[in-house]
Curated annotation (Swiss-Prot):
GO terms for biological process: rRNA processing. It is found in: Cytoplasm. NCBIfam families: rRNA maturation RNase YbeY. Its main location: cytoplasm. It comes from the Bacteria. Its EC number is 3.1.-.-. It is an enzyme of class 3 (hydrolase). Binds 1 zinc ion. This is Endoribonuclease YbeY.
Amino acid sequence: MSVDVTNETQWVIDPKVFSDLGIWVLDQMRVSTQSDLTIMFVDPNPIAELHMRWMNLEGPTDVMSFPMDELRPGDGKTVMEGVLGDIVICPWVAAQQAAAAGHSTMQEMLLLTIHGILHLLGYDHVTPEQERQMFGLQRQLLLTFFALRHDANVQATLPAGTPDALALYDAAHGAGRDLDSK
């Protein structure tokens, strides 16, 4: 199983943590060990462009998933192999959401990674029942992953003096964006 992690931001992010999480979640969901996944961390501008292009929604968002092969979770046996797809995460939006939720940016980005994987596997949260199922599963996966890890306190940070890319985005594109209205 291959999980490639790319960081195109100034955030200091340990790619191994996200690779380990991706491999573990795919194993738990019984996706073939021959499957590939890419996780990419980007700044607000690139994810805002993707958000507009693919969802016709303005502004940066927290996570977007781009499926490749239509792989689905296994039912006790491993599913066929293939390229699962790409997950794009914006640490700036994750940090804002984490502050509002009262947990760390790292915890939020790990949650968003699981959320993105579940979308790639066909889960959605359009209806209340779908939301209950998907959010329950992502919470269960995240808490179990934390329980199994000995380094659960690893953090994602910004070097001192790094400009706030989300504030710069808002200044260039107009403030007043409401993250809760996604």
